[in-house]
Each structure stands twice: as C-alpha cells, then as structure tokens.
A protein has these predicted regions:
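Sec/Tat signal peptide C-region and signal peptidase I cleavage site
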Residues: 16-22
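Bacterial N-terminal signal peptides
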Residues: 6-16
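Primary mode marks residue(s) on the alpha4-beta5-alpha5 output face of response regulator receiver
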Residues: 22-196
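Positively charged n-region of N-terminal signal peptides that target proteins for export
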Residues: 1-4
C-alpha cells in the first residue's frame, strides 16, 4: 500500500518537477555565450562543451583552435558561469568533472587529481590560460548571446608547481595585481581579476 502511494504521488508530481527545471538553451545559444570570455580572435575556432536536451554534457562544437569552452550549466539556475581553457588542460578539467559527477566534493577533488598528476596519470601543461565570466543568472541574456557589464571576468594562467619564489608573484591577493593561487601544487595558477 505504501509503495503504491509513493508511486502514485511521484507519477502525479513528475510533470510538475520536470516543468520546474529551466529549459536547456539551444546549442547555438550555448555556443555563443560560452565563447564570450575569450578574446575575439579565439572564439570562432574554440571547441565548446555544453548540454544536450537531456542535460548531458556533450561536445556542441568540435573546434580547430587551442581553446575549449564550457557552457553555463543549466542546472545552476541562480548562477551563471562560463569558462574557456587551453586544450592542454582538458585531462585535468575532465577528471574534475568526472569526480564531481561521481559524488566527490570539495578538496577531495583536488587531492585525487594531485595524486594522479604526481603518479603520471594526468599530464599537466607547462603553462595554460583560462578565461571565465561569472555572476548571478541576471547577467546573461542567452537568446541575445550577451552578458551585462555586471558579469565578473577572471583570467588565469596555470603554471603547475609555481610559487612566489619561482615566479616573483605573491601568494596573497592584491587589488589590481596578479597573485599565485594554490602555490607549489599541480593546480598552481596566476590569478588576474580585473576588479575585486
């Protein structure tokens, strides 16, 4: 009886739950917005990963350029985030996505990846760039393929194992200046935030 009641309630609510999820934008809209963090010269040739109508991460466009862009996740309805990174970072980035999809969270994602880098399972580039735009959902107009000036830009140059001593860049954030985040780790990178 209880099982029948649960099944009946779920069946009755399923259409409402599905309708409550934000629709997944068409591929062309996802692509147009995903490449916005990049300088214009890199946009047309970037590979773009985005979401199928079923919500699965797929390759929306297989580009010939050096950059890979990740479209905004439609499951994150209140937030907006797109990022583009050099293709040499894909093994590291893909592993992070796989770990999160399997339920690994927080610092554990990096601890697993760091061990795998040290074991030679993930190869890190000598240096690689990442460009991103973030904000709340109001900063993007998917249909128009635009973001508002309220979208926050972030620029990163990955330099695995870099430290203040090896780079001449401080580890503490400084307004208007670069700093090294995660110094001494495989994920070490120079942060450039246009405004803090």
């Amino acid at each position: 009886m209880r099982r029948t009641l649960v099944l009946t309630v779920f069946t009755a609510l399923a259409p409402a739950l599905l309708a409550a999820q934000a629709p997944i934008p068409p591929a062309d809209q996802q692509i147009a917005v995903a490449v916005l963090p990049l300088p214009a010269e890199f946009r047309a040739d970037a590979t773009v990963l985005g979401y199928s109508p079923e919500g699965k991460l797929v390759t929306l466009r297989d580009g010939k350029g050096a950059m890979t862009c990740l479209a905004d996740d439609p499951k994150e309805e209140k937030a907006f985030h797109v990022a583009c990174y050099h293709k040499s970072m894909e093994p590291f980035m893909a592993r992070g996505r796989a770990l999160r999809a399997s339920g690994v969270t927080g610092d554990k994602v990096d601890s697993v990846r760091f061990k795998e880098v040290k074991a030679g399972k993930i190869r890190m580039p000598k240096q690689a760039a990442l460009w991103s735009l973030s904000g709340d959902a109001s900063v993007v107009d998917m249909a128009a393929g635009k973001v508002t000036p309220a979208a926050r830009a972030l620029y990163v140059v990955y330099m695995p194992y870099a430290t203040p001593a090896t780079s001449g860049i401080p580890a503490a954030p400084v307004r208007g200046a670069p700093w090294v985040m995660y110094p001494g780790t495989p994920k070490a990178h120079i942060m450039f935030v246009p405004s803090m």
